[in-house]
Amino acid sequence: MPMSSFKRKIKAIQIKIASPEVIRSWSGGEVKKPETINYRTFKPERDGLFCERIFGPVKDYECACGKYKGKKYEGTVCERCGVRVESREARRKRMGHIELAAPAVHIWYLESIPSVLGTLLNMSTSDLENIIYYGSRRVIERAFIVTDPKDTPFSQGDVIYETEYRIYRKKWDFDVEQAFVVKNPKSPVLSDIDGEVTLKTEKSITGREITWIIVKNITRATHTVLPGMILVVKDGQEVEKGQDLTKEMTIDPVYAPFDGHVEIDELSNTITLKPLTTSKDQPVVFTIPYGAKILVSNGQKVKKGDQITTSTSLPAVKASISGTVRFGSNLNIRALEDGNFEVLSTGEVYVEQVIEERKYPVFEGALVYVNNGDQVKKGDHLADRFLFEEEYLSATEYKIFESHYPTMFDVEERTENDRPIVVITDIDPEVSKETGLKVGDIVTENEYEAYLQIYPEKIVADAGAQAIKKLLQNLDLEALQAEIEAELKKLPSSSSKAIKLRRRLKMVKDFLKSGNKPEWMVLEVVPVIPPDLRPMIQIEGGRFATTDLNELYRRLINRNNRLKKLLELGAPEIILRNEKRMLQEAVDALIHNGSDSEGKRSRRAVLKDRNGRPLKSLTDLLKGKKGRFRRNLLGKRVDYSGRAVIVVGPNLKIHQCGIPKKMAMELFKPFVLAKLLGEGSSSKTMRKVKKAIIEKEMPEAWEVLEEVIKGSVVLLNRAPTLHRMSIQAFEPKLVEGNAIQLHPVVCPPFNADFDGDQMAVHVPLSAAAQAEARFLMLSRYNIISPAHGKPISLPTQDIIIGSYYLTTVGKEFDSLKEEDVKWKFSSPEEAMLAYHLGFIKLHTPILIKVAVNGEEKRIKTTLGRVIFNGILPEDLRDYNRIFDKKQINALVYETFKRHGIDRAADLLDDIKDIGFHYATVSGLTLSLKDLKIPPERDEILRKTWEKVRIIEENYEKGFLTEEQRKSEIIRLWMSVTEEITKLTSKTLAEDPFNPIYMMVNSGARGNIDQVKQLAGIRGLMIKAYDPRSREIKSKIFKGQAIHEALTFDYPVDKNLREGVDILQFFISTYGARKGQVDTAMNTSFAGYLTRRLVDVAQSVTVAEPDCGTHEGIRAMDLIKEGTVVEKMNEFLFGRVLARDVLDPETKEVLKNPETGKEYTRNTMLTDDDANFLASYKKMVDVVRYEEIDITELSLPNMYAEIAEPVGEYEEGTELTWDVIKAAKNEGKYRIKVKVYPVVGTVYAEEEPLYDKKGERQLLVYQEVINEIVAKMLEENGIEKVSVRPDIIVRSPLTCESEYGVCAACYGMDLSNHKIVNVGEAVGVVAAQSIGEPGTQLTMRTFHVGGVMGASDIVSGLTTVEKTFEPYAFLREEKSGGKKEIRKYYGSEAILCEVDGFVKDIATDESGRTVIYIEDYAGNIHAYKVPKRAKVRVEKGQKVLRGETLTSGAIVWWKLLELESEKGVMTAMNLLKIIKNAYVQQGVSIHDKHFEIIFKQMLSMATIVDPGDSDYLPDQLVPLVDIKRFNREILEGNAKVEENRKWVIGKTLAKRIITETEEGELVELAQKGDEVTEELLKKIIEAGIKEIDVFEKDKVVTYQILPKEPIKYKRRLLSLKKAALNYPGWLSAAAFEETAWVLTAAAIEGKVDPLIGLKENVIVGQLIPAGTGLDVFAGIQVEETPRAAVEEELA
């Protein structure tokens, strides 16, 4: 038996960060290859992105190789291909995964603002990005060169940069010199002089070789030295001319020292004496001195003592010039012990005199072109270079080269390097202490290497996502929480550091609370979404079209596989880094490709396809209008629907619509089939036959269709669906043709016309849906608009003209006396007969007998009026009235109020029939002759042009400025236009049956403005303008009539009937185009407004019948700048009283004398009640003297003071029970009192009441009179005052329901004038009611007629936008902690902060205007007026708290701070402004709708002091949550003592960490410890306010110290902000900034309780409003009546 039940299945949804294990658990297998589909077989590749083994079979119940086919094998895993046999639906659900070769950071957590990773790790986003993407840091630093390594691993000449040097320096001892980097050395090295080359090499201080090329230009004196001479100079010694080079000497003869043989060597000029073989003597060598003779021959034997040579003398050789001694290259000498040299053979000694010398040092590695002794010419090449580019020189080396090559090269003292950075992930505590480094610090790779050398294996640093992962794994969140809390205690709460810390603390707490692990923000595994959600489709030409996601996945897999391969090969680090970075970028692109539109900079390259279009990533699939949320979850397509053009259906009833037969057959096909099948058997062949019957359109099919349709309803919808009346239910009637027929009266709610509009039809399928549609949505029950409570389904155009024509009369009718009437009838039937027989016409005056209020009367009327009144309810008939549009509307409304909705619906049908009929009969036509031009027009124009000429003359003579001239002309033409308009109207009215007059006058079409342009004068034209233009801005600031800047001062003085000339035509085009453009521009804007409104208010439903509050808002006329925006009766209509309404005089509950209704608390006010209460006023005494009997058990029911002293109470004290007690103690029974009946009433006269002198206003309209004011009245001798009762009505603003509003505070459901039902979606209704007319609120800046003030420019939508987004127009700039308002329109309005009087308005020394206000106590308050503002008050005027003293924009937060908790004053001010915008456009919307939106805008508060909550100062928190939290704290604080007893003996569920006074973290207790009294005492002393203990395997938190409540300030949010701060994350994510909302929610592990409507639509269940409420959940609806009977039988 088919049944449908409305159980809501999902209670709440939680979002968390997925851990790698969770992702793997979702997966059906790892995707290892980037392949998708085999291009030949079109089958998915194994292990690829579409693999059947991982994701499920492509064909239903068939494995890949085809071994198993059919449902019987369901669940079998094929052993050949590994595919599980199941439904192909699995490919929509089963996921895969990719194991990453290196971790990758999830971009949402990095790029969110503020960055989650950044906040948690306390790092800046740029540093994080640098680490994740292997970035580098640019370092400008000095370099050093090691000159002496000592006991370090360095070598001499190693270059060390400053950063490393500082690190090494602390631990090691070695010597360095600063290094200089050589730049632009000039080459080659050229000789500057002619000369001889000498080469010399030496080692520098850094152990490198320097070759010295020395070129000398010299004169040389040669001196020959002979053997035996003794040289007394050294090589290189300086000598003077004539100085001895050798000694002068006499050489003795040589004698043989022993016996032996002589050997003479003439070549070397020596004699060798060899001893005899028997001797032990050694051989001796003698040099033969120059000039000595040898006395022996070669080989001769000599005896000891024989003379061998003769003696000789050698002269001294003297230097012939001064200079340097140089030994010749052939000089053979022997060094002697005294430092001189003995010459062994003849040679040369030179004395060189250097004329010029040049030294050229050359660094090692340079190529030297010359050798020692080479002669070079000036300009010859000596070497290819002296230094290399980028060579590092030590300071000493630099000095050498600098002195020899002063301008030949540059140096840099500091070098600029890009250093890869790494982050420390692990460090030995001692090393940390020593170096000051900690985990999470960023160092360059060079620094890291330095630390590693000093502390091997004690420090670890890394870059890339793996480093971030390690850091996150290292976080001890509990310790971190204790640390931050301890640090916060030391800081002032408003400091920026504290705010930053609090943000971090909140995040830490979120992670702890949600159970998310921080390292999960770094992905090891990437999930692959099911293939059917990213399909590949074959397109013609054999190619494949695929989703961007596949391309992103492919890139990711390719990079991942390449990285795996490189890791296996052991590739160098630099290649791996690059590959890892690319992998990270691939993961980023998959999750969020592209720089974000939300104003974030992105360092990543956007991945694009062939056409350069960015690929759509997962984030793009969620966000925006085309995203998953708004496109698919909130905007689903509906089956069983059709769409067609609409045409008018004049013979339909109001609840019917015509559906084309073909369409109906298609829509109801299943029902028709079922009906046909129900008769015969249900075999397959029968099915086919029946289907054929339908498809071949056989007659029996149509019969069955007629039967099926009977009693069912369909829904009709016209886009755009701006409010709920855009979808209504109708009973379908089958019609021929292809168009849907629509009843003409329901056009206004649909905003439909028949110029080609289309409408959609939907069929509610289940019985429950049918019932809902029929009883709640049927068009006859939706005549009344929920926006304002008046009818909205109304007759228009032809129907109105028909009714008007029927009831109108000729000119002579009113003047005709009854006795002159020719025709008299006894009954309407008789009159009709006369009409049909042609005796009378519809408009012939007749006398006729009709029943009026139950009695027969003879009246003068016309047959038309009799016919029309025939269809009206008897008590509403009026035979002497013309029924135009207004009258008909009032008639329908009155019928609804008196006789209910059904009678009203029938009346609409009757009016439609009669209207159409008589519109046809009337033969209404239009011709040019009907446009009557007023004869006086030409004369008026002539005079006007004359006046214009005079103005122009005055201007030319200089009597008027340009501004004044323009202004005068415009005013003149405006008044003329108005005059001609009146004349045109008058001229037309001369013939009541003039078709144009009838159309305009009846309200059927057109207005007098259009007629004026056709037959009168077009008048002044508007310019198109740019609101940002300087002219316009300056006008606004000066507060001038803005329209003057926007108007041509040359009028179109012709009308369209006679035609305009070329110039005037061109002037007209401006305005025409502006209208078009404005409309186009504002439609989308209005749509966005509606969307924001709905988002803000969607969760407001009627939650309970009564919240029980006694609060409310005061009923009053809404007055904005002197104009009444809304009268009090409209304000009261549909509301519920919050308190009894008391008669101002008697103070008893007020009673309506006509109906006898008493106005007590919780009474709902109808139209009549509202009119009665709004008009009820009385003259009441200000004061009365009475003597009262104090033995009675009640005080007087009005404010009273004692008129004589009683006990210690002085005269004038308020009469209370204490005073009476004192009187009784004195033995009195009666005391004299002054009673003030006016206290607590409201002043009801529009003219203010002045004091005796007439200088001061004592009372202003609508002021509530208190005792202070009453005494002032008394002092000024005022005896009686006209007052009305103080009426407090309930309002959504003051409702105390936790969610939504209660029925009593909302009041009447305007669409049926009954109290609203629980579950009604009042928020959405409110949003629609405000948004729907938005399109009408286009910038109608130019109202022709009446001079407009500056307030007009900001008309319409701009005003609405300004009110709902109050901060978009006021830029708050914080300077020095003070908020300053930058003006948008004019300046800021000054608010009065007290009740009082304007004492004076004066100017101070600086020339600024100051307003002095005196309050009731006589204190003076001064307010300085900003330069551009206008003073809005005058001396002696009474002002009340919160009123504006000057022109300008109200700064809402200032107003909010002025008032009490409720925010009512702010809301009422907003209401005035916004109502004004709508009223000007003639749009009526009930206040309660605005109040609901304002309630939502005021629903948040800013935390001033978070107390013991997890909130941060300045955080926005729903008021409900704050109040709940504070309530819980008060309850919790009461239980502290009890809890302390309870926890003794329990086991701790979490460890307890606290900070000592020295700032160290200590652990007080471990998890699992037992709580003893001693431990508890310690915990309490440490200031820990709650502990977690185990109770029956559950963790329970106990509060053991009192907590601080939250202090807060009410905030007025803009619509957008209010929607984004919505507590449920699903709805907020669907609104805007999807990624950020989801990120924040995932971290918190946020639970969406699915309270609002949107969330439930998103998860696909009934909304918790109306029949979707849990109250109705148990109801089961029988689909077929038979089933119940069967059940009984069973």
UniProtKB/Swiss-Prot annotation:
Signal peptide: none annotated. It is an enzyme of class 2 (transferase). The keyword Metal-binding applies. Mg(2+) binds at D753, D755, D757. Binds 1 Mg(2+) ion per subunit. Binds 2 Zn(2+) ions per subunit. Disulfide bonds: none annotated. Pfam families: RNA_pol_Rpb1_1, RNA_pol_Rpb1_2, RNA_pol_Rpb1_3, RNA_pol_Rpb1_4, RNA_pol_Rpb1_5. The keyword Transferase applies. Zn(2+) 1 binds at C63, C65, C78, C81. Keywords: DNA-directed RNA polymerase, Magnesium, Metal-binding, Nucleotidyltransferase, Transcription, Transferase, Zinc. Belongs to the RNA polymerase beta' chain family. The RNAP catalytic core consists of 2 alpha, 1 beta, 1 beta' and 1 omega subunit. When a sigma factor is associated with the core the holoenzyme is formed, which can initiate transcription. DNA-dependent RNA polymerase catalyzes the transcription of DNA into RNA using the four ribonucleoside triphosphates as substrates. This is DNA-directed RNA polymerase subunit beta'. The gene is rpoC.
